[in-house]
Amino acid sequence: MKIAIFTTGGTIDKVYFDAKGAYHVGAPMVRELLVHARLEDIPEVVELLRKDSLEMNDDDRQLIRTAVAECDAPRVLVTHGTDTMVATAKALQGIGGKTIVLTGALQPGRFADSDAAFNLGLAFGAVQLCPPGVYVVANGAVFPADKVRKNLELNRFETV
């Protein structure tokens, strides 16, 4: 089963930047997390962007959409910052014949207490099992793109 993985940045890829505790988006964590999960066959990981999702714009979403639409894999996993993940998921709707799953993390993937490995594992399963469509995976759930929002007050995703 062919799966494409695209990375766009976000907290999942963040690293400490300076002594003040500021972060910046570093190299993608996906491959490292999948190696730790002991996957037998790790798909190629393509870095599209290295941005905090709050810095993403419509041009970035179009770049992601084009990459997803033009890749030959019927199943696509996209790592993304959580703040604007839903907006990007909605921008990917309408791409036919593909199962597209977006996931990210609320804590950097390099942190031991991060939700990154769990979210990525669930997303990897979802991309293989869900029918064609666009989904957001977070907080132990798989949400259809048109039925999810991020509750900023609770810092979690929920069904709408």
Model-assigned labels for residue ranges:
Residues 1-160:
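Active-site histidine-anchored catalytic micro-motif
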